[in-house]
Regions:
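Carbohydrate-associated surface elements
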Residues: 161, 183
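Nucleotide-activated donor-binding/catalytic signature segment of Leloir-type glycosyltransferases, i.e.
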Residues: 247-265
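Short hydrophobic beta-strand element within catalytic cores of glycosyltransferases
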Residues: 302-305
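Aromatic "clamp/platform" in nucleotide-sugar-dependent glycosyltransferases that forms part
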Residues: 285
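Short alpha-helical donor nucleotide-sugar binding micro-motif in glycosyltransferases
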Residues: 264-265, 272-277
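Nucleotide-sugar donor phosphate/pyrophosphate-binding loop at the beta->alpha transition
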Residues: 17-24, 74, 117, 127-147, ...
């Protein structure tokens, strides 16, 4: 029996770049898809600087077509030729952004020569007015997204505030947008009971080290805290374009014996760091969901966040004392007082249980959204 494909297009190679964790997440999607409909198979057309192979399995095929590219015309042509060679019949195209990935899907539909629905996945809060003000590239991308979002069959968002921004600022209909957060790897997290006495006096920044992720806000924060007390450690996990300059400036503030710089980590390695983390800070001016914030809360680590869609959704949905907004304009003493208060706050097990329960259904929700588009 011929199986049709749910096709994921990844011209910039984000799936390959994400490594084993991201690939395994897509494999979970594929297994869930097979359990619901053995007539469909997940196929990923991706790129990579390192891999040049094709990966086949019972549940998912992954084709590495080239090095990462920003050219949707070239990548759509390569994808089309490969799909014809593999005799793949595409029933749905899933794109990962409103730009290169969407236009790859748009041109691929033209090459296929028949109507194929396109689901656009938007993880960032691109419709937040603050996002387009970060730099001139974002302003251009905002207006490009306004057009491409109107052309997509369906849009998968990751949070309620993000959806509200898409509706309000991109003039999209409610019915076009489905909220399905990115699943967490709960198996890797420590779900044992946590005592406050075990929480270390440390502050952590986790994620991409890019200009738009609030890294200079973090530097200002640890500067202020350091002016009041030297009795805390700093943990930095992640990598990115601004890594060299940022870390050099952090080292001028925090001595080596109080500083852990751990680079990019796998989900399993990151999970082991939560028991060494006192408070997680999230200082990106625009945050749509905050998967790391949720992983921290499940692990019993309180979150100190700048006001964003992701933080506001957490606060409004769960009303927990373990999630607080940070006032970066506050005095050094006021910030230290808030930091020490968070170190002592009790873990919120009710919140943890809700997040774990919510996470269980996310893979199935995403796959169902694909099958519904195929049926329609």
């Amino acid at each position: 029996m011929k199986r049709s494909a749910i096709l994921i297009l990844d011209p910039r190679g984000n799936i390959s770049l994400g490594g084993k964790d991201v690939i395994n997440r897509h494999l979970e999607y594929a297994k869930n898809l097979y359990s619901k409909s053995d007539r469909h198979k997940l196929v990923v057309c991706s790129t990579s600087y390192q891999e040049k192979r094709t990966f086949y399995s019972k549940f998912m095929d992954r084709y590495i077509l080239s090095k990462p590219t920003f050219n949707p015309l070239i990548f759509s042509w390569r994808a089309y030729r490969r799909l014809r060679k593999e005799k793949v019949e595409v029933s749905l195209i899933v794109v990962s952004d409103p730009w290169e990935s969407f236009w790859t899907g748009f041109f691929l539909v033209k090459l296929i020569g028949r109507k194929v629905p396109i689901q656009m996945q938007i993880h960032g809060d691109i419709a937040d007015p603050l996002w387009r003000k970060i730099n001139w590239k974002n302003r251009i991308r905002f207006y490009l997204a306004k057009y491409s979002c109107s052309k997509a069959t369906s849009i998968r968002a990751v949070g309620q505030s993000q959806k509200n921004n898409l509706i309000k600022n991109l003039s999209l209909s409610k019915s076009k947008i489905t909220i399905i957060p990115v699943p967490m790897n709960i198996k890797a997290l420590n779900l044992k009971n946590l005592r406050i006495a075990q929480r270390p006096k440390s502050i952590a920044l986790i994620g991409r080290i890019h200009q738009d992720r609030g890294i200079w806000n973090f530097l200002d924060l640890i500067n202020k805290l350091n002016d009041v007390s030297r009795d805390f450690d700093v943990i930095i996990i992640g990598s990115g374009k601004a890594e060299s300059e940022f870390l050099s400036r952090v080292k001028l503030v925090i001595p080596r014996q109080r500083l852990q710089i751990l680079g990019q980590m796998s989900e399993e390695s990151l999970a082991k760091m939560w028991n060494k983390t006192g408070v997680l800070v999230s200082l990106a001016p625009v945050e749509s969901y905050g998967r790391v914030m949720r992983e921290a809360l499940i692990s019993g680590v309180p979150v100190w966040a700048l006001k964003s869609s992701g933080a506001l959704d957490l606060i409004s949905e769960f009303n927990s004392k373990t999630v607080r907004l940070i006032d970066l304009n506050g005095s050094a003493k006021a910030l230290m007082k808030e930091f020490e208060s968070l170190i002592r706050v009790k873990p919120d097990y009710k919140l943890r249980n809700k997040l774990v329960a919510e996470n269980k259904s996310l893979v199935s929700m995403l796959v169902n959204s694909w099958l519904n588009l195929v049926k329609n």
